[in-house]
């Protein structure tokens, strides 16, 4: 089987992740393996964990952790989600399903690429406007 490389970042690192509004991801133009620190200077502050997974390996990702995955060859993987046991995590899950996905879907249909461009700009501005940048 093919090797899979995973980078994990704790939820505390969210302010430097260039999180795209109304989504569950960072900017898709970021290459976390070869970051462009001129374009995305906050990436230099990230402290992540790396894991190399081979056929049959399992990786547990705690709730709220960011992950970036690359494959060395053609492959597939399977993710399983557990129902949240903590009320705080349950409310986040419901907000994500009911609010975030709905707003994203409606706005993407209404505005198309303009919506994506708007959110990408906001992601960058939010990170770069931090006091310690």
Segments and roles (model prediction):
Residues 54, 65-78:
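Ligand-binding loop in jelly-roll beta-barrel domains
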Residues 41-43, 47-57, 86, 91-133:
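Conserved double-stranded beta-helix
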Residues 29, 73-89:
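A short hydrophobic beta-strand segment most commonly corresponding to one strand
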Residues 23-25, 35, 78, 86-87, ...:
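Short, charged/polar low-complexity linear motifs in solvent-exposed/disordered segments
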Residues 61-64, 112:
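C-terminal transmembrane module of eukaryotic multi-pass membrane proteins
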Residues 1-60:
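Double-stranded beta-helix
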Residues 3, 13, 66, 83-85:
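Short, glycine-/Ser/Thr-/acidic-enriched flexible segments
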């Amino acid at each position: 089987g093919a090797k899979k490389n995973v980078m994990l970042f704790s939820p505390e690192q969210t302010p430097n992740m260039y999180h795209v509004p109304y989504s569950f991801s960072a900017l898709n133009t970021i290459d976390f393996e070869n970051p462009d620190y001129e374009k995305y200077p906050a990436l230099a502050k990230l402290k992540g964990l790396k894991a190399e997974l081979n056929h049959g390996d399992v990786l547990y990702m705690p709730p709220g952790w960011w992950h970036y995955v690359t494959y060395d060859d053609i492959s597939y993987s399977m993710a399983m989600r557990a129902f949240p046991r903590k009320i705080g995590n349950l409310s986040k899950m419901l907000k994500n399903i009911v609010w975030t996905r709905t707003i994203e879907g409606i706005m993407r249909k209404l505005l198309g690429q303009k919506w994506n461009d708007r959110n990408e700009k906001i992601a960058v501005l939010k990170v770069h406007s931090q006091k310690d940048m």
